[in-house]
Amino acid sequence: MATVVAAAFVVGGLLVAGSTPPARRSSPVTVPIRGVRVYLDVSGRSPDHPGETHLTFDGNPRTSWWTDAYLGPDKAHFGGLYDGEGLAIHLARSARLQRLTVMSSTRGWAASTYVSTHGVAMSAPLADWGQMVSSRRNLQGSASFDLRGRSGDWVLLWLTDLGPAGLANVAELQIRASA
């Protein structure tokens, strides 16, 4: 009798094992970056180091783009000259975006993120980027931002606080999206 019960369990297990498994959620994939530009919502001002933005996606964490160094009592907030400066990240394709990872050695920095389905003029008002997606403060080096599944092919990393040193760097950017 025990042999018959054991055989029933084995046969039952084989039937379950042969059935279609439940669908798995696919892992996020890295979306290639086509280019990065410095974004300012203040016309008439020169962006900080626009020729070095390619260093944010060159695969080398020892190279980076830097803001200018700001001085004075409000140096963490761009010397009181304006509200922020950003990196407009143009992706190789539109996707449902999950996460932006920023490699940085800056201490005490803050930033917000925006996602767009179209390019925005580099001196257009910040409102042209649409609704803010996420925001983080008092970051101690590298950080990740939740892009909440928003669809787009442009991401803006909008720096709002440079930390106590009065300057910030971005060594590498990576964007992950739904497969």
Language-model segments: residues:
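Generic signature of intrinsically disordered, low-complexity, basic-rich segments
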Residues: V4, H49-E52, R107
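Disordered, acidic Ser/Thr/Pro-rich linker "stalks" and the adjacent N-terminal cap
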Residues: A17-A92
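Aromatic, loop-rich ligand-recognition surfaces of beta-strand-rich domains
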Residues: N60-L126, S144-A179
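Solvent-exposed serine/threonine-rich low-complexity stretches and specific carbohydrate-binding patches
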Residues: L126-N138
